[in-house]
Design a protein with these regions (language model features):
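Long, contiguous binding/interaction regions
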Residues: 1-166
Length: 166
């Protein structure tokens, strides 16, 4: 984590003493840097999940960037509209149906809506699609809107995909 001119490294390890030793060796190459080490046990991973792990919007931003980088590696023209599919999951059929109404109001086509036969808590899958461009800022806006709808109905947004457009 980098903030206010400081770089903080967090290591999760089964051998804290060895990790501290390795840090000392690595940082010895930078004698002008001030550094400290702290060892703290976090069996429940509270610090990781409550501080280091990204919130849902940051996580989706990371995932969006990953998909877009893949598109760019394949010479995609991000500004061209194409069908973008999204997957969302809900705990109840009622909430899935409420979400579907909202998606339709936003111009999405409902590709499928079904109950999954697995043991997951979110058994109702909704797959939607709409013509959109894949420009990073635009994708973030539409994904965040879908995240908000899903979360307001006790569901979650699982991601998006599209064909490469040249």
């Amino acid at each position: 984590v980098k903030t206010q001119g400081r770089l903080e490294l967090y290591l999760f390890t089964k051998n804290p003493e060895k990790s501290e030793e390795l840090c000392k060796e690595a940082l010895a190459k930078f004698p002008d840097y001030l550094w400290k080490t702290y060892i703290d046990e976090d069996k429940e991973w509270d610090f990781y999940y409550n501080f280091l792990y990204p919130d849902v919007y940051s996580y989706q931003t990371i995932m969006n960037r990953s998909v877009i980088e893949n598109l760019l590696e394949n010479e995609d023209k991000l500004e061209k509209e194409r069908e973008i599919d999204h997957w969302l999951y809900f705990k109840t059929e009622e909430n899935a149906n409420l979400a579907i109404k909202k998606f339709e109001e936003l111009g999405y086509e409902i590709l499928s809506s079904k109950k999954l036969e697995d043991k997951s808590e979110h058994k109702y899958q909704v797959n939607i699609s709409r013509m959109d461009n894949a420009i990073y800022s635009h994708v973030n806006e539409i994904v965040w809107e879908l995240v908000e709808i899903a979360e307001s109905l006790d569901g979650y947004y699982d991601g998006w995909g599209c064909n490469i457009t040249k």
